[in-house]
Amino acid sequence: MKQYIFFLALIVLTATFAEAGKKTEILDKVKKVFSKAKDKVLAGVEDLNNMSELGCPFIDKWCEDHCDSKKLVGKCENFDCSCVKLGGK
């Protein structure tokens, strides 16, 4: 979410430079920076997806152990651990 706000702020700054009549060289440099940043973010998302496939069993086990210590049942979904009380007691 913070990344989207950052990119939105940079877009607003870019539009401000364009409205102020700055040279296109500045805009071209900013566009190149945005392009590189976008590529890095997309590469990071790809890496995170690859790591999540490997990390899920460890996180699931941690979640189960964490909730078991509270005498609850653990459910891990999208890296979010939820402890649920089963039964009527």
From Swiss-Prot:
Inhibits voltage-gated potassium channel. Pfam families: Scorpion_toxin_alpha-beta (PF14866). One of its GO terms (molecular function) is toxin activity. Residues 1-20 form the signal peptide. This is Neurotoxin beta-KTx 52.1. Residues 21-39 form a propeptide. It is found in: Secreted. Expressed by the venom gland. GO terms for cellular component: extracellular region. Belongs to the long chain scorpion toxin family. Class 2 subfamily. Residues 53-89 form the BetaSPN-type CS-alpha/beta domain. Disulfide bonds join C56-C76, C63-C81, C67-C83.
